[in-house]
From Swiss-Prot:
The keyword Membrane does not apply. This is 1-(5-phosphoribosyl)-5-[(5-phosphoribosylamino)methylideneamino] imidazole-4-carboxamide isomerase. It comes from Gemmatimonas aurantiaca (strain DSM 14586 / JCM 11422 / NBRC 100505 / T-27). It catalyses: 1-(5-phospho-beta-D-ribosyl)-5-[(5-phospho-beta-D-ribosylamino)methylideneamino]imidazole-4-carboxamide = 5-[(5-phospho-1-deoxy-D-ribulos-1-ylimino)methylamino]-1-(5-phospho-beta-D-ribosyl)imidazole-4-carboxamide. It is found in: Cytoplasm. The lineage of its organism: Bacteria, Pseudomonadati, Gemmatimonadota, Gemmatimonadia, Gemmatimonadales.
Length: 237
């Protein structure tokens, strides 16, 4: 079980949102490079970078992500608006260990299969979830797709993992959706990483007990509610 700090990018800065709502931005830090370095120095051995602007189609942070990847002291997974093969290739060329694909991987089964086979072991499929339904396009659209059905459809693909975000709990620091995460872990053939509401070491232990491979953490780390050094000592590697 590994703890993975999130570096969410918006307008060239590091931010944290509440409940997946772009109007509720609770954290904004001007220097994402410094933020990422601090997480590495604290003892975390993996990083999660998301381009929120690209996810919503309102811009992109490609040059900043390239700089973050080249500067990083630890393996990095990158997502947000990754919807074509050339972007996957560019991210890997720039140094991403894994690429997180969401909206197009949900909506286009043929593309999902083609990309997974073209980049075996390098793709993490994101299932952003609200009320057990998969949401897409930067959490703006809710599909009719049940998350368990979706995760089961990924079984034959050579993935690096599945990232499940409980969007309804994102940034609220009220704990994560344990029943959801447990059900996804049971349904998945691949390592499952939880995101959304993970706030305490108790949350981490509960996820570990339910078979999760790791968790992406944001608000609890940025606000100091969760002791970053202690978390890194227990779940940094």
């Amino acid at each position: 079980m590994i703890a993975i700090p999130a570096v969410d990018l918006r307008g060239g800065q590091c931010v944290q949102l509440v409940g997946g709502d772009y109007e509720q931005e609770q954290v904004r830090l001007a220097d994402p490079l410094s933020v990422a370095r601090d997480w590495s120095r604290t003892g975390f051995t993996r990083m999660h970078i998301v381009d929120l602007d690209a996810a919503t189609g309102r811009g992109q942070n490609h040059e900043l992500i390239r700089d973050l990847l080249r500067d990083s002291m630890v393996p990095v997974q990158v997502g947000g608006g990754v919807r074509d093969e050339s972007r996957i290739e560019r991210l890997i060329d720039d140094g991403a260990e894994w690429v997180v694909v969401g909206t197009r991987a949900v909506e286009d089964e043929d593309w999902r299969e083609e990309m997974a086979n073209r980049f075996p072991g390098r793709l993490i499929v994101a299932a952003d979830v609200r009320e057990r339904r998969v949401v897409t396009r930067g959490w703006a659209e809710t599909s009719r797709l049940d998350v368990i059905d979706f995760v089961e459809s990924l079984r034959t693909l050579p993935l690096a993992g599945v990232l499940v975000t409980a969007v309804h709990l994102e940034g609220l620091m009220q704990g994560t959706d344990l029943p959801l995460m447990e059900d996804v872990a049971e349904a998945s053939a691949w390592p499952v990483y939880a995101s959304g509401g993970v706030t305490s070491l108790e949350d981490m232990r509960a996820l570990e007990h339910r078979g999760l491979a790791g968790a992406v953490l944001g608000m609890a780390l940025y606000t100091g509610v969760l002791d970053a050094r202690r978390l890194a000592e227990e779940y940094g590697a």
